[in-house]
């Protein structure tokens, strides 16, 4: 089993890349870090406003699950219900014969989370600020997190970009074995550029 960690700023294309890679490798499984969000009911108003910040994730559970995956080569993992905007326990299964597991999320390459060394290969997905904001704004509108275009854009430029700064300041990009530059979408096609560290 080959373990790949895919990190990057919000809206950079981590999930898109993970799904694309998994579709090319029969039996590959994607484990999204979104499954480790703390449930909305457990967060106060500030937690809901800043949801996606490091402290709004079940960090210890994530690390324990990654350690178990590395050690046992199998496991059951949470997914994320976008309709409920909450984690969904036990919906992703990895078997010993699974050839590749792609773990994607904001903080998979964070130094103090203690998981980046567990991956056989680490990818950081880079993206221009304005392109990421455009994607995030669209995502917030589609998911109902933005009651208007203005509210959705404010969230993307505010809370989401605060999380991006945490990731960049931590040196996640420099910890990657490969940096993929996600270009502007045109007609559903995303341009990728590669820069090996």
Predicted feature residues:
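The Walker A (P-loop) glycine that initiates the GxxxxGKT/S ATP-binding motif of P-loop NTPases
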Residues: 8
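Conserved lysine of the Walker
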Residues: 14
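Conserved nucleotide-sensing/catalytic segment adjacent to the nucleotide-binding pocket
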Residues: 29, 38-84
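Hydrophobic positions on the alpha1 helix immediately C-terminal to the Walker A/P-loop
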Residues: 17
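Small-molecule kinase domains that catalyze NTP-dependent phosphoryl transfer to phosphate-bearing small molecules
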Residues: 141-191
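Walker A (P-loop) phosphate-binding loop of P-loop NTPases
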Residues: 11
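ATP-dependent NMP and nucleoside kinases share a basic, alpha-helical "lid"
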Residues: 85-142
